[in-house]
């Protein structure tokens, strides 16, 4: 006995009736509550019927009064318990519960089918068990239906089960008043419900009330009629179950065999053998609701013009009519499963009319009466009907029934890309005229796979077996243009986000259970061998549905939102890497590393030092004015004078505004201004801003100026602009978000394996002394883990969703990959080799045939000869040289085959990575990641790590929110030093945005040469001037750490021989600025007179590919060097030209306004007709 977990629901294989028992208990509780209410009204008649009749007959007057009182009580409760409407509702309620039980059996049958695909032997083992349970359930349903109809009228059973004395009195009294009873029945219409309830009638009879004898007669008469109806209904239901049981057992046949069986059965109806009663071992048992609600195999053939073999003779057509009248007719009041809310989504028809099976001479009308299913949608039916319409318009009436059936099967198989393994469709051809209308119609329904197999005959050929048909459907699905575009979006979105994909597919619990338990290494290769290659080429219908769900999620824009600090103590990921959070925290606290974290987090997040905050007013006696006109009048200014407020060290901006006649308001908190420029967005009161007041920040600008806000919104470009953000933005994860934290852990593990593949490649290429089993295991495992991200996206979803095979790194695999036993540290290896080279016998083991190593060996030989002064003709030396040469040849032959095999494997893995991963070159050899605090600037709190444990030590326990970003391990170096670029830009309005790009940037260099092995040296990796100035040894000439754009462009031109910067780099910078701001335009609080002056940080790799690092709000405007001094003065003067001269000019004169170095590279124009935004690019 074991349990399974499919689609988030747990179910026991050996106990399929657990849900049924639970529903029966609920039904009994409901029935008990109803009977309790009825029993209160039945108490007095039950005492009369089941008690001592002599005592009640002697006290006739008291009984008559009690009967009158009870009669009035029954009249009041007649509507609640005894009206025909209430009985019908009660009956429907019981039938609804039974249909819900059937619905649960249907769901369980679907789960069994998924399990049987994984383990076919399990189907044979549980076949007899399912047969036994199915027959028991059918009998239980029959008994419930029969008993339920008797429980509708409980007084009948009470009268029949009463004392013998009372029953004798009733029979005698009714026999003496037979004529009177018949007359009263005719007067009352034969309906005892019209006057009085059966309970009060029984009481009146026993109490001796002669006027009520007619009701007692009606009770017995109607009870006999209802019993006959129940027996007839029971027989009808029994016939239905037998017919359904035989339908389930019937084997599926190919079309050719079915047509042959039809002809043979029609010619000799007596030769038809009875339907088998045993369940087949090849087809799973399905229930009644499952047969009629699943459009598959034989049930599907009823509605596609295809007749099963059992419905050909006249006798079988009578059975079919019984089946339709008992189960499929919604007009039948006993078929409540059609209107049952539990089966509303599962029912096949929406109307009460059944589809008619057309004759063979009218195949073009086979789709006319089919009602669309509420579960399967209706695309294929509308498509088929439209194709038949086109056939009729074109006069193509030569298509036979068999071709029409094959066309339906083709539409099913290709539209859903899944064909069941048990379908035995023969190889047939469908003639479809390739008109333009047909092609347009097919393209609209995304069924582009129905094409002509050849241009001469225009035919579509079906495969002879299910595997080929499924594979062809899968290939056609992959070749569709729309699906290809959606597939690329999914691949780009989930390329590094495995945790999010597992969460969407509902496999999060399996994912965590995989992390918590150390399982054997389970790779995709082993799964392929276990399941067989045919499963790799099949996509089930569930897989297609889940892929469509994934596509919808990708198409849904992610919203930027604030979130609290993530609690790492509850992460199962930390347990998978053997990271003890509490133990690490205690160690960190003992070393007093966390003593100053709170004070550091409270520092300012701006990139510039602010001037000391002045008082609210220089004149304390002056009253603060809230109206700008009154403030100007109070300060004796012209009403046309413009007023500005600047909070921060922007002296050049202040000077530029004063040159234009603007007056500064010294009160930072005053609402009287035309322009306000601050360092922090918190200094702006957006609620009280006037429409014409200009401010230099947008509300909620953290969507693109914060580190995790930028990373989150850039991912939305995949569906809005179809742009792969990972081509220009290094992958970045927010460690404060649980989903992204899990993505980072898995991505770190895969990147670690790929970095080891790089190092193994160089080691095998340069020569290796020996390859033992452990090293070979690690090399092969690293290649296997690194190549998992290259598996096709649809196959990955199929593995995860259907087989619970997760492409993540298991704890056992990570334990092997993360060990330092075979870590190829250059320093350790060089020391090891130098020590071994001292022994002449083992020289041949450590040298390859490379030219550099041969020269190095010759140098060592010469130096050894000079120091020892050996004779060149010494025979001992010649003998040792010959022996070493022979040993070297033997060793090369011994390891050449295995090392060459492993080297080819590494080359193949890295080649795939370079083709499919846009950030392949960023990974490098060390797997370095850079950790940044979210709201800090100027290089504060930024550190580099290549160890997962060290990253956790630095992050866990701090209140600061961190992001981790992939370090660019192949940066372009200037004089062997790392550098980055600062580029200024201005964005206005945001509805739509207007983006200005400053024509000149500058380069910031590090003061120490680049060395990826020295991760703790901030002067090697951080280019911020505020960081580099603390390096007193190298900061003597600070101008050497800056480079202008012209100098940098000239350096690249001299290096490459062409103008790389202006031809390749700068156009890419403009596009990245545009796309980064467009990604968050619906997240920013758009305002007409708001703007943002921002500074972009870019890096360039060794392939001259620029990468966006971050966007800074209120960038530093300090005169740190002579280069920045000149540029800062220019950019602030030109900023005034944009926000004052250009923005405040009239529409007709804006073209002639000088904007200095700022160029408008993007301007969105509103389209008033459809309220859409059109973008126009300007160079």
Swiss-Prot record:
EC number: 6.3.2.-
GO molecular-function term, one example from the UniProt record: protein-glycine ligase activity
An annotated GO BP: cilium assembly
SUPFAM superfamilies in UniProt: Glutathione synthetase ATP-binding domain-like
EC category name: ligase
InterPro entries, per the entry: TTL/TTLL_fam, TTLL_monoglycylase
Name of this protein: Tubulin glycylase 3B
């Amino acid at each position: 006995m074991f349990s399974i977990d499919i689609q988030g629901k747990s179910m026991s294989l050996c106990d399929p009736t657990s849900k049924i028992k639970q529903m029966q208990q609920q039904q009994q509780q409901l029935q008990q509550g109803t009977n309790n209410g009825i029993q209160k009204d039945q108490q007095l008649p039950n005492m009369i019927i089941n008690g001592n009749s002599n005592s009640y007959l002697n006290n006739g007057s008291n009984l008559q009064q009690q009967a009158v009182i009870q009669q009035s009580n029954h009249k009041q409760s007649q509507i609640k318990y005894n009206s025909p409407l209430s009985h019908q509702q009660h009956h429907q309620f019981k039938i609804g519960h039974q249909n819900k039980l059937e619905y649960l059996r249907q769901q369980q049958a679907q789960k069994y089918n998924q399990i049987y695909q994984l383990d076919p032997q399990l189907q044979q083992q549980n076949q007899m068990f399912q047969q036994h349970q199915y027959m028991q359930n059918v009998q239980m349903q029959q008994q419930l239906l029969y008993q339920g109809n008797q429980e509708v009228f409980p007084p009948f059973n009470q009268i029949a089960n009463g004392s013998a004395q009372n029953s004798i009195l009733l029979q005698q009294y009714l026999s003496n008043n037979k004529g009177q009873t018949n007359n009263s029945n005719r007067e009352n219409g034969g309906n005892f419900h019209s006057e009085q309830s059966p309970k009060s009638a029984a009481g009146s009879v026993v109490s001796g009330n002669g006027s009520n004898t007619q009701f007692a007669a009606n009770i017995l008469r109607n009870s006999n009629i209802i019993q006959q109806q129940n027996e007839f209904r029971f027989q009808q239901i029994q016939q239905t179950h037998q017919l359904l049981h035989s339908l389930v057992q019937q084997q599926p046949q190919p079309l050719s065999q079915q047509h042959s069986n039809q002809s043979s059965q029609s010619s000799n109806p007596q030769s038809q053998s009875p339907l088998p009663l045993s369940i087949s071992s090849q087809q799973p048992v399905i229930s009644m609701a499952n047969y009629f609600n699943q459009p598959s195999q034989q049930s599907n053939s009823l509605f596609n013009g295809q007749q099963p073999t059992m419905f050909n003779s006249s006798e079988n057509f009578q059975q079919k009519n019984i089946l339709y009248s008992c189960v499929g007719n919604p007009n039948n009041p006993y078929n409540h499963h059609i209107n049952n809310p539990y089966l509303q989504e599962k029912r096949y028809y929406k109307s009460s009319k059944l589809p008619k099976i057309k004759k063979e001479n009218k195949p073009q009308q086979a789709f006319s009466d089919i009602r669309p299913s509420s579960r399967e949608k209706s695309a294929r039916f509308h498509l088929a009907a439209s194709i038949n319409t086109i056939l009729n318009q074109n006069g193509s009436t030569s298509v036979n029934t068999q071709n029409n059936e094959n066309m339906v099967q083709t539409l099913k198989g290709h539209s859903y890309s899944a064909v069941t393994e048990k379908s035995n469709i023969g190889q047939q051809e469908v003639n479809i005229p390739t008109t333009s209308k047909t092609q347009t119609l097919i393209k609209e329904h995304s069924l582009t796979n129905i094409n002509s197999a050849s241009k001469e005959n225009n035919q579509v050929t079906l495969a002879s077996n299910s595997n080929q048909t499924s594979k062809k459907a899968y290939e056609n699905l992959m070749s569709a243009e729309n699906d290809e575009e959606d597939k690329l979006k999914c691949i780009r979105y989930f390329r590094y986000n495995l945790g999010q994909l597992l969460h969407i597919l509902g496999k999060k619990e399996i994912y965590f259970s995989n992390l918590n338990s150390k399982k054997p290494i389970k790779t995709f290769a082993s799964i392929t061998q276990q399941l067989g290659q045919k499963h790799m080429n099949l996509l089930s219908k569930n897989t297609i549905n889940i892929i469509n769900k994934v596509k919808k999620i990708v198409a849904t824009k992610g919203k930027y939102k604030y979130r609290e600090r993530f609690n790492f103590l509850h992460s199962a990921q930390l347990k998978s890497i053997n990271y003890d959070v509490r133990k690490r925290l205690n160690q960190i606290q003992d070393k007093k590393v966390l003593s100053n974290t709170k004070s550091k987090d409270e520092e300012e997040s701006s990139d510039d030092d602010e001037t000391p905050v002045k008082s609210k007013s220089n004149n304390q006696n002056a009253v603060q004015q809230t109206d700008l006109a009154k403030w100007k009048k109070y300060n004796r200014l012209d009403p046309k004078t413009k007023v500005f407020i600047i909070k921060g060290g922007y002296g050049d901006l202040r000077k530029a505004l004063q040159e234009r006649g603007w007056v500064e308001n010294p009160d930072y908190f005053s609402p009287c201004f035309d322009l306000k420029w601050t360092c922090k967005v918190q200094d702006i009161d957006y609620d009280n801003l006037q429409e014409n007041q200009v401010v230099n920040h947008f509300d909620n600008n953290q969507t693109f100026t914060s580190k995790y806000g930028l990373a989150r919104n850039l991912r939305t470009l995949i569906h809005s602009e179809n742009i792969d953000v990972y081509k220009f933005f290094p992958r970045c994860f927010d460690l404060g978000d649980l989903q992204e934290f899990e993505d980072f852990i898995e991505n770190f593990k895969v990147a670690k394996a790929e970095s080891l593949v790089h190092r193994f490649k160089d080691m095998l290429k340069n020569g290796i002394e020996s390859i033992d089993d452990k090293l070979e295991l690690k090399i092969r495992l690293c290649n296997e883990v690194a190549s998992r991200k290259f598996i096709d996206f649809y196959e990955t979803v199929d593995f995860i969703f259907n087989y619970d095979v997760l492409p993540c790194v298991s704890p056992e695999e990570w334990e092997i990959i993360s060990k330092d036993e075979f870590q190829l540290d250059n320093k350790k290896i060089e020391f090891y080799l130098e020590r071994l080279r001292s022994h002449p016998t083992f020289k041949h083991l450590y040298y390859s045939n490379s030219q550099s190593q041969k020269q190095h060996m010759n140098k060592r030989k010469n130096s050894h000869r000079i120091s020892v002064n050996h004779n060149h003709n010494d025979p001992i030396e010649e003998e040792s040289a010959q022996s070493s040469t022979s040993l070297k040849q033997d060793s090369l032959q011994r390891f050449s085959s295995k090392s060459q095999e492993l080297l080819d494997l590494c080359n193949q893995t890295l080649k795939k990575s370079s083709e499919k991963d846009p950030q392949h070159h960023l990974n490098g050899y060390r797997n370095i990641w850079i950790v940044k605090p979210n709201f800090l600037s100027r290089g504060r709190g930024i550190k580099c790590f290549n160890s997962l444990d060290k990253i956790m030590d630095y992050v866990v326990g701090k209140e600061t929110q961190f992001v981790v970003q992939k370090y660019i391990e192949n940066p372009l170096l200037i004089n062997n030093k790392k550098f980055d670029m600062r580029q200024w830009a201005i964005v206005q309005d945001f509805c739509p945005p207007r983006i200005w790009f400053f024509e000149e940037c500058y380069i910031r260099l590090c003061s120490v040469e680049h060395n990826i092995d020295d991760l703790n040296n901030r002067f090697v990796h951080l280019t911020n001037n505020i960081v580099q100035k603390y390096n007193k040894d190298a900061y003597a000439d600070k101008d050497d750490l800056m480079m202008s754009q012209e100098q940098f462009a000239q350096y690249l031109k001299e290096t490459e021989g062409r103008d790389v910067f202006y031809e390749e780099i700068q156009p890419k910078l403009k596009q990245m600025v545009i796309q980064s701001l467009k990604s968050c335009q619906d997240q920013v609080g758009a305002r007409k007179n708001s703007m943002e002056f921002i500074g972009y940080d870019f890096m360039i790799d060794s392939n001259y590919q620029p990468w966006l690092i971050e966007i800074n709000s209120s960038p530093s405007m300090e005169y740190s060097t002579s280069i920045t001094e000149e540029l800062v003065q220019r950019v602030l003067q030109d900023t005034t030209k944009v926000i004052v001269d250009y923005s405040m000019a009239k529409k007709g004169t804006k073209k002639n306004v000088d904007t200095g170095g700022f160029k408008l590279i993007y301007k969105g124009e509103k389209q008033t007709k459809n309220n859409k935004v059109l973008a126009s690019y300007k160079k």
